[in-house]
Amino acid sequence: MEREEIVSFLDEYLSISSYPDKSSNGLQVEGKEEVERIAFAVDACLDTIAKARAFNADMLIVHHGIIWGGVSYVKGLFAKRLKALLSSEMNLYVAHIPLDVHPEVGNNVQLLKLLNLEPLEPFGEYKGIKIGYIGEFEEPKPLPMIAQILAEKLPVDYVRSYEFGLQEIKRVAVVSGAGGFAIEEASEKADLLITGEISHADYRTAEDLRVSVIAAGHYATETLGVKALMKLVREKFGVKTIFIDSPTGL
């Protein structure tokens, strides 16, 4: 399969150029023209690159790439990561915000699906766009039950539940990864915010606004879109794929 055919499909399907994002979405590193084996991971780090090489991957598709806000110098850790990719002629394709917001394979839609919810409306204002969604249960569910479902379905050792608001939850807002910025909006539009992680300051914001938050793991909540995209690419192009798990515990 030609690289450009895969890249063109991903660029269009994920609307790569439609979002303001410093993470240089799309093909970050150009490698082999022919692609038969594709590795998928959350992060492009030395661990996942090495495991992709062991799989003999022609392309690595990730949520977090190696370029953030442009390149000034090619040295240090950046040089090591780049060398690891170039030495094996491995393509690196990145979908950061585009994979958060996508209405079919996106992290946030997939997070709602774990709770058997459908996206009702966009949520989570970030640089002028909504990157998350709101879903709604037909009948209210106990907050501990929701936390337990996520703990069972996500690749995470535990979830943190900050029970500052309602115990019976009907409207759920989701923002994968670091979604603390959406706490204020959640206090106005939902009974619960589900995200990956929050900061110390975010904790106090949620406490003062009396809104409950579940932090289910930054890494764990962002495996969902990558895995959904992997399934789509495998079925569409008939390539061999692998998901490389490299958890951070965060």
UniProtKB/Swiss-Prot annotation:
<comment type="similarity">
    <text>Belongs to the GTP cyclohydrolase I type 2/NIF3 family.</text>
</comment>
<dbReference type="GO" id="GO:0046872">
    <property type="term" value="F:metal ion binding"/>
</dbReference>
<dbReference type="InterPro" id="IPR002678">
    <property type="entry name" value="DUF34/NIF3"/>
</dbReference>
<protein>
    <recommendedName>
        <fullName>GTP cyclohydrolase 1 type 2 homolog</fullName>
    </recommendedName>
</protein>
<feature type="binding site">
    <location>
        <position position="63"/>
    </location>
    <ligand>
        <name>a divalent metal cation 1</name>
    </ligand>
</feature>
<feature type="binding site">
    <location>
        <position position="64"/>
    </location>
    <ligand>
        <name>a divalent metal cation 2</name>
    </ligand>
</feature>
<keyword id="KW-0479">Metal-binding</keyword>
<dbReference type="Pfam" id="PF01784">
    <property type="entry name" value="DUF34_NIF3"/>
</dbReference>
<dbReference type="GO" id="GO:0005737">
    <property type="term" value="C:cytoplasm"/>
</dbReference>
<feature type="binding site">
    <location>
        <position position="222"/>
    </location>
    <ligand>
        <name>a divalent metal cation 2</name>
    </ligand>
</feature>
<comment type="subunit">
    <text>Homohexamer.</text>
</comment>
<dbReference type="InterPro" id="IPR036069">
    <property type="entry name" value="DUF34/NIF3_sf"/>
</dbReference>
<feature type="binding site">
    <location>
        <position position="100"/>
    </location>
    <ligand>
        <name>a divalent metal cation 1</name>
    </ligand>
</feature>
<feature type="binding site">
    <location>
        <position position="218"/>
    </location>
    <ligand>
        <name>a divalent metal cation 2</name>
    </ligand>
</feature>
<feature type="binding site">
    <location>
        <position position="222"/>
    </location>
    <ligand>
        <name>a divalent metal cation 1</name>
    </ligand>
</feature>
